[in-house]
Amino acid sequence: MKEIKGLARVKFLPGKLEEWKRLTEQAMEIVRTKDKGTLQYEIFFNADESEAIVFERYRDSDAALEHFANIGHLMAPLMETATITGELLGDPNEQIRRNLTGDQPKLFTPWIALSDEQPAAK
């Protein structure tokens, strides 16, 4: 399983939702035009837009690193708009593992799966 998945949980600071939306629209444009290995990049809101989930899928560790390099300049401004926690899912390469300091994001490695790579029996 080479794919890397990310799940970010976002709780907006008071009055910062519109700024976060503006910044994530910039991020989405970068993903669309510069990222080569991003397979999925979706944002979901709860009913009152006080929280969001960002779901990301990358072809492999190199694609995830490319994405982080492309949007890195947006991370500090985004962190000023919300409390963000997250999970990284997959078996990332050593470069990504070295960058995982502290407790965020939390890394979860594969155990068992039903996916396109390992479909159910017919």
What are the functions of these language-model segments?
Residues 1-52, 59-70, 79-122:
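Short S/T/G/P-rich N-terminal loop/turn motif that feeds into the first structured element of a domain
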Residues 74-76:
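A short hydrophobic/aromatic micro-motif that marks alpha-helical segments and, especially, helix-coil
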